[in-house]
């Protein structure tokens, strides 16, 4: 017995069998790599990943989990999502692009697996948080399994495998790390402030880009980060709407639309810090961010960013009024907002048609007509495809299956709804948005039931951002900001668990 392990001698025949099996597998791998080459590198490397997982699983149990390293890695991951261009990467043949985001995500997943493997306390805390609403994590697991299964019927298996692994790393790092960290007191508020700071950094880069006419790093990228890809070249060159010729700011994002989405998703957090009783300097900084963010959205020339701001403001007003009414029973203003809310929605909707500038920002003008028409055509083209195969065509295949090309002759798909339906079918669509809708429901319920709990107030911007996300994804297919959504889902689940746990403790 050494170090908690017991030495065991295996029969000679078993050892010979295992050595022979290893040699045969090595010969097979060598033959496959020699005949197919680097495109098969991802598949050939799968057993190595399995060995790492088995090694982590075999670690002796004990309370020595490296959970302290999760926080710096996590916030580096949060910052990289907004501040590092995801198209600047090291490219090795047969492997996905080695970006900063994927590298940090992989390290997070590795540390997280070690913590889960060795620490019973760590597992217990995560299990308690996930148990706050099992429907959500079950939807997430089912959605991941569906993604994995779709590789089997995908017409381009290698590309789909790359997409699956990259997606699982980003989602796993974002969701499960957040499940653990957001149980800490005050962590949700700290995350929200950090989120606003990093998005503000992306906005400042966007303002700089607007002065230069292209992203600041165009022409100044180190050789080891340069990717010989026409899409990347187009991003670095910058873009403009064909009807106006005016440069559209994109900052670190791959498109102006993704930047506008990111700023729109952050709006509820800025509104939160302006609205509640935070120190004056924080409220002023949040107000300044609102002005800057709105200005950068205008520079992106993206309607979806304005829509996200509008949706966030309207739904935040409702949740704020509910909390005020629940806290101050004698209030007149708060219940007046709640009861008149249907009228507020109707007025807001009608104003998008009657007010000229508002109509242009929401529904577009002549300059955006081509984009509007393209989205209509895509839905018309997609419906027969969805009817032919309601189970989807495989991860990462939606654009090819749809077959739509924009005016420049480039394949395009403009709705994440379509992407889900074409990739994973009706089931995938239901699992993904069912998970988000359920999170919104339990978050709103906690706000209503425990309005005075500081953490339940903090859940409001997370819930509102998820509502805005559902609206925005109807007109944007890219998943550039997907990691933030998984963080928000986990944040809501963790806050719900904390508030309910505190309520039980108070009753006891």
How should these model regions be labeled?
Residues 73-78, 284-294, 444-475:
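Loop-to-helix entry and N-terminal half of a specific, functionally important transmembrane alpha helix
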Residues 353-424, 443-450:
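Long extracytoplasmic/lumenal interhelical loops at the membrane interface
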Residues 278, 310, 314, 318, ...:
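Hydrophobic transmembrane alpha-helices and their immediate junctions
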Residues 50-53, 310-314, 461-473, 477-508:
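Transmembrane alpha-helices of multi-pass inner-membrane enzymes
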Residues 140-152, 173, 190-322, 445:
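Alpha-helical transmembrane segments of multi-pass inner-membrane proteins
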Residues 18-29, 65-172, 469-472:
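N-terminal hydrophobic segments of proteins, predominantly signal-anchor/transmembrane helices
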Residues 247, 251-257, 294-298, 302-303, ...:
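A conserved mid-to-late transmembrane alpha helix and its immediate loop/hinge
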Residues 34, 201-217, 300, 317-366, ...:
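A membrane-periplasm/extracellular boundary helix in multi-pass inner-membrane enzymes
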């Amino acid at each position: 017995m050494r170090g908690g392990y017991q030495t065991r001698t295996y029969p000679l025949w078993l050892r010979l069998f295992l050595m022979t099996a290893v040699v045969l597998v090595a010969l097979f791998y060598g033959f496959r790599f020699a005949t197919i080459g680097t495109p098969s590198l991802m598949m050939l490397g799968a057993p190595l990943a399995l060995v790492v997982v088995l090694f982590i699983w075999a670690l002796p149990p004990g309370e020595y989990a490296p959970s302290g390293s999760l926080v710096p890695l996590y916030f580096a991951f949060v910052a990289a999502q907004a501040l590092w261009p995801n198209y600047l990467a090291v490219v090795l043949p047969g492997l996905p692009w080695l970006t900063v985001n994927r590298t940090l995500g992989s390290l997070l997943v590795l540390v997280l697996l070690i913590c889960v493997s060795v620490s019973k306390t760590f597992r217990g805390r995560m299990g308690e948080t996930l148990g706050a609403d099992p429907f959500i994590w079950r939807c997430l697991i089912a959605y991941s399994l569906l993604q994995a299964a779709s590789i089997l019927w995908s017409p381009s298996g290698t590309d789909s495998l790359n997409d699956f692994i990259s997606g699982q790393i980003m989602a796993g790092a974002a969701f499960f790390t957040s499940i653990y960290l957001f149980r800490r007191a005050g962590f949700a508020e700290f995350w929200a402030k950090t989120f606003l700071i990093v998005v503000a950094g992306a906005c400042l880069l966007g303002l700089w880009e607007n002065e230069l006419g292209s992203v600041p790093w165009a022409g100044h990228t180190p050789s080891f980060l340069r990717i010989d890809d026409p899409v990347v070249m187009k991003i670095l060159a910058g873009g403009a709407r064909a009807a106006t010729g005016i440069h559209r700011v994109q900052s670190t994002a791959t498109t102006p639309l993704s930047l506008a989405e990111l700023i729109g998703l952050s709006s509820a957090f800025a509104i939160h810090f302006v609205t509640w009783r935070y120190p004056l300097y924080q409220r002023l900084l949040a107000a300044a961010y609102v002005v800057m963010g709105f200005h950068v959205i205008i520079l992106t020339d993206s309607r979806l960013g304005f829509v996200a701001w509008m949706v966030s403001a309207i739904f935040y007003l409702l949740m704020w009024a509910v909390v005020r009414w629940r806290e101050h029973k004698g209030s007149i203003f708060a219940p007046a907002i709640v009861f008149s809310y249907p009228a507020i929605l109707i007025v807001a909707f009608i104003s998008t048609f009657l007010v000229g500038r508002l109509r242009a920002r929401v529904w577009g003008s002549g300059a955006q007509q081509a984009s509007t028409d393209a989205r209509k055509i895509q839905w018309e083209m997609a419906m027969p495809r969805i009817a032919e195969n309601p189970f989807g065509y495989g991860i990462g295949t939606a654009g090819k299956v749809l077959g739509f090309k924009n005016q420049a002759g480039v394949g395009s798909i403009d709705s994440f709804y379509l992407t889900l339906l074409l990739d994973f079918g009706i089931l995938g669509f239901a699992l993904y948005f069912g998970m988000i809708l359920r999170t919104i429901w339990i978050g709103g319920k906690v706000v209503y039931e425990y309005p005075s709990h500081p953490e339940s107030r903090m859940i409001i911007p997370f819930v509102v951002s998820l509502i805005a996300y559902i609206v925005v994804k109807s007109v944007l297919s890219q998943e550039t900001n997907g990691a933030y959504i998984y963080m928000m889902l986990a944040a809501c689940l963790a806050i719900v668990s904390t508030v309910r746990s505190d309520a039980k403790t108070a009753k006891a």
